[in-house]
Amino acid sequence: MENENLTKRVAVLSSPEYARCRKKISEGLDLIEFNETLQGKKVLLKVNLLSARSPENCVTTNPAFVRAVAEIFLERGAKVSIGDSPASVSTAVAAHASGIASVCEDLGVPLVDFDDPVPVVLEHGTYRSFEIARPVL
């Protein structure tokens, strides 16, 4: 990314309820000076779809939070996708139960699963090879 300070800055803000989290997310991005244009860049929102549970169970990433983040990045020109690979059920089943699938449908962004890993080989580094989900590349 163009902003070198991005990896060095963190903003922690409180929101009394998910319905109003978009404003806090925007404030947080301003606090870390995330002002990059994302025009045409791919952004994968990696959610936590631990199981096929509704948002009220607080098991998965809340769909209101996912919607807010996705909308902000879409407005900045990003090509957003949302994904995960739950261990207990399929991504589609967990996303439907959690409300994440509705967010994807409403915003026209793809829901991707991480069930198709591809090998990655590096010349240098601690790990010379590993597998990563195809949508992450």
Residue ranges and their predicted role:
Residues 1-137:
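N-terminal and secondary-structure boundary signal
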